[in-house]
A protein has these predicted regions:
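Alpha-helical recognition segments enriched in aromatics with Gly/Pro capping
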Residues: 1-100
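Feature 926 captures the class I aminoacyl-tRNA synthetase adenylation module centered on the KMSKS loop
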Residues: 18-21, 55-56, 71-173
């Protein structure tokens, strides 16, 4: 009953009245937030604000937490799941720093034959990402495609592979 008619209609009417213009063309509303598999509720005493969660984990971590689930699904908030989101962000940041390092310190010269083949395979990740987003804004699968890309890029651009600056730059871009 929480999100039953006319909840969203009232949100739209209030926003349009306050701002004097059309609200939005697309609007997504995530599922309810559960705390350790129980509905979040002031009456249950398991209520928190976004500011409180951000103080503990950071806003980027909360964003990742939300992106890792489909927007129509309930979100299960727990310390363990927030740590998974934090670790996911750290993997992305580590990959970025790794690419930046090799853009500055990799071998000079053109892409090698192996690197050229790797670069030719990169569009498949964009295709997977776009397919997930086109599938009812499936951010969980889109994030999975990003992490497949990160895994392959980390293998291709590592000290063991002795990459060129050019490969690091292509992957970074």
């Amino acid at each position: 009953a929480d999100l039953a008619f006319p909840h969203h209609e009232n949100e739209i009417a209030q926003s349009e009245a306050a701002n004097g213009c059309e609200f939005v063309h697309y609007w997504l509303h995530n599922g309810f937030i559960n705390i350790d598999n129980k509905k979040m509720s002031k009456s249950l005493g398991n209520f928190f604000t976004v500011r409180e969660a951000a103080a503990a984990y950071g806003y980027d971590c909360i964003r990742m937490f939300m992106l890792m689930s489909h927007y129509r699904s309930p979100l299960n908030y727990s310390g363990e799941i927030l740590m998974q989101a934090k670790n996911a962000l750290e993997r992305l940041n580590t990959a970025k720093k790794n690419l930046e390092f090799f853009m500055a310190n990799g071998k000079d010269g053109e892409l090698t034959e192996t690197e050229t083949a790797f670069v030719a395979a990169l569009p498949k990740f964009r295709e997977k990402f776009c397919a997930a987003m086109d599938d009812d804004f499936n951010t969980a699968d889109a994030i999975a495609a990003i992490f497949e890309l990160v895994r392959d890029v980390n293998a291709a651009v590592s000290p063991a592979s002795d990459p060129t600056k050019a490969l690091a730059k292509v992957c970074y871009d």
